[in-house]
Amino acid sequence: MFVKSTTRHIRIYAAEVHNSELVESDNMLTLDVDPDNEFNWDEDALQKVYRKFDELVEAASGEELSDYNLRRIGSDLEHFVRNLLQNGEISYNLKSRVLNYSMGLPKVESPETEGAYNL
């Protein structure tokens, strides 16, 4: 079994994709963002996740390729996705197979609460 990290919205594998199959690799990581399509993504938001992934991998270069190190990267990316959601850069996909609001209930502004909950 190859080294991997899986969170709700981020999956990282020490593998390459060949003919739609993952093949173990010691020098290639494969990133799968939001595999259940829980969020609505635009290209800019996805590119931010990819850039953050590249930064985290670069920062970890020279370290052992282990489940632990990949989980650290995956956890950091999961928090990054949460920030994108909280900043309104992505939103919940209301047509998703399952609506579980895993990162908190959606914020809906109303005239009574507009601006009242700014952090």
UniProtKB/Swiss-Prot annotation:
Listed EC numbers: 7.1.1.-
Transmembrane spans: none
Catalyzed reactions per annotation: a plastoquinone + NADH + (n+1) H(+)(in) = a plastoquinol + NAD(+) + n H(+)(out); a plastoquinone + NADPH + (n+1) H(+)(in) = a plastoquinol + NADP(+) + n H(+)(out)
Keywords: Membrane, NAD, NADP, Plastoquinone, Quinone, Thylakoid, Translocase, Transport
One Pfam family recorded for the sequence: NdhM
Subcellular location: Cellular thylakoid membrane
GO molecular function, one term: quinone binding
Membrane topology, from the record: Peripheral membrane protein
Annotated Gene Ontology cellular component terms: plasma membrane-derived thylakoid membrane
Similarity remark: Belongs to the complex I NdhM subunit family.
Self-association state and partner proteins as the record states: NDH-1 can be composed of about 15 different subunits; different subcomplexes with different compositions have been identified which probably have different functions.
PANTHER family in UniProt: NAD(P)H-QUINONE OXIDOREDUCTASE SUBUNIT M, CHLOROPLASTIC
Free-text function comment from the UniProt entry: NDH-1 shuttles electrons from an unknown electron donor, via FMN and iron-sulfur (Fe-S) centers, to quinones in the respiratory and/or the photosynthetic chain. The immediate electron acceptor for the enzyme in this species is believed to be plastoquinone. Couples the redox reaction to proton translocation, and thus conserves the redox energy in a proton gradient. Cyanobacterial NDH-1 also plays a role in inorganic carbon-concentration.
Protein name stated in the entry: NAD(P)H-quinone oxidoreductase subunit M
